[in-house]
Amino acid sequence: MSNSWWLKPAQAIDVPMREAALARQQQLTKPAGSLAQLERLAVQLAGLQGRERPAVDQLWIAIFAADHGVVAEGVSAYPQEVTGQMLHNFVNGGAAISVLARQLSAQLDVVDLGTVSPMDLPGVRHLRIGAGTANFAHGPAMSVEQGLAALQAGRDSVLRAKAVGTELFIGGEMGIGNTTAASAVACSLLECAAPLLVGPGTGLNAEGIQHKTRVIERALALHAEQAGDPLNSLFCLGGFEIAALAGAYLACAQEGIAVLVDGFICSVAALVAVRLNPSCRNWLLFGHRGAEPGHRHLLETLQAEPLLDLGLRLGEGSGAALAVPLVRLACELHNGMATFAEAAVADRPA
């Protein structure tokens, strides 16, 4: 494809700043390694931000919303109109991610990529690619042109974020049926059996999970030629919001903005991004381990070290947002603690 912008290498890690941050950690008034993952997080951020003392003051949360044609197969516990209703809820401040964004003083960018019913909501950026995806149980979820537009929508949000000095980017999603699409994409990329990854999504019972699994298995057979191919798997089985998330993660890595990845659906988008451009992996931090059974498998595949494990399954970017205070505290500890020399404390046990 011409203008395959996603293949541009990610920005390089600032190794000298990372090493300087590591050296500082070793001089702080605590036993070496005692703050464990928080130490590693601060050092990692120092390398990503190119400064010995990192900070996460400017936070951008982008929510990409779209509907899914596969809902016609009866794979969701909720009706499709909920996607549009939640767009209202996001901009009216009543959704979980809206509350979290306020508390974290984050910029909230809500993007409609294609709900079934067109809407004109103040506070929502309307970048309609279509009236939801097509039913991937019968054909490709989207055309190549639609898929490229969705990738670009994610990139556009990142460029907006960069323009205001964003230091950490969180992507979230809304779309009834999107755990089905995400599971299908993951199965195609990992070339694994659907029962290993498929879960309840928004609340299916055991019978519903079995039906959802069968729908995905039929779709995987239909699109078997795309197995292992990140772009084709995304376009044949994914959703506009999943493609936008993948585009956002790729753009963040290219623009030098650290990412805090949310749950199962966002991790599938991260897998797509890494398969398209492995150099973006260094820029991805992971907020939490969710309840969806496939999430653990994805995190292992991506060699991720999530910050939280609360059994969450909401989406919207909520799990990543909940991890932001830990990220900020990791920076505060790194930046604010005294060194042994400053505190006149012996730096070795007697």
UniProtKB/Swiss-Prot annotation:
Keywords per UniProt: Cobalamin biosynthesis, Glycosyltransferase, Transferase
Domain of life: Bacteria
EC number(s) on file: 2.4.2.21
GO BP term, example: cobalamin biosynthetic process
GO molecular function, one term: nicotinate-nucleotide-dimethylbenzimidazole phosphoribosyltransferase activity
Signal peptide span: none
Class of enzymatic activity (EC top level): transferase
TM region positions: none
UniProt xrefs under Pfam families: DBI_PRT (PF02277)
InterPro entries registered for this protein in UniProt: Nict_dMeBzImd_PRibTrfase, Nict_dMeBzImd_PRibTrfase_bact, Nict_dMeBzImd_PRibTrfase_N, Nict_dMeBzImd_PRibTrfase_sf
SUPFAM superfamilies with a match to the protein in the record: Nicotinate mononucleotide:5,6-dimethylbenzimidazole phosphoribosyltransferase (CobT)
Active-site residues, as the UniProt record annotates them: 316 (proton acceptor)
Catalytic activity annotation: 5,6-dimethylbenzimidazole + nicotinate beta-D-ribonucleotide = alpha-ribazole 5'-phosphate + nicotinate + H(+)
NCBIfam families, per the entry: cobT_DBIPRT, PRK00105.1
Family from the record: Belongs to the CobT family.
HAMAP family: CobT
Function: Catalyzes the synthesis of alpha-ribazole-5'-phosphate from nicotinate mononucleotide (NAMN) and 5,6-dimethylbenzimidazole (DMB).
Name used for this protein in its record: Nicotinate-nucleotide--dimethylbenzimidazole phosphoribosyltransferase
